[in-house]
Amino acid sequence: LDLEISANTETEVEACLNFSNSFADMYGPGPIYQFGQPTGFYGEQNCELPEDWSLLGILPHSHLMGTSWEVYAETPEGENLPIIKIPNWDFDWQGFYYPEYMQHIPAGSRIEAIATYDNTSDNDMTWGELTTDEMFFCPIYYIPYEEGDENIYLGIDTQTSISENITNI
């Protein structure tokens, strides 16, 4: 869990669940960073929320071999809450995506992040920060939920709104 703190005059904003136990895990072998894998490799990771969240934004991040992204939450009752689905990933789409309104995700929900890659025999993948390397990285920006958060309009223009640019589940 990698937390970054940002503040404004009214509230402190918690951020950045990057689906890794620590920053060091991003540089070592692990279930989602072993990129020299057979054809059809994909990254998948999940986490269970210890508290209710209000989702503010998400940053799915892959490089040139990324082919798709899907992130959703499954509530303890089994309800599927779509967060983002990008069936045809494009390198130029790296960036933050914001819901039109804060999205409430209940405590105990499991967030799943899944990305696929074109790692055919002609596309040998290694993890790294260069464009020609590859990544599976998906920070989620949130604040602890308060009643009524889901009614708060984030005021994001439609050029970066999840609901306007990305196909939901």
Go through the PLM ranges and name each one:
Residues 149-169:
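Residue-level detector of functionally pivotal "anchor" positions at catalytic/ligand-binding pockets or at interdomain
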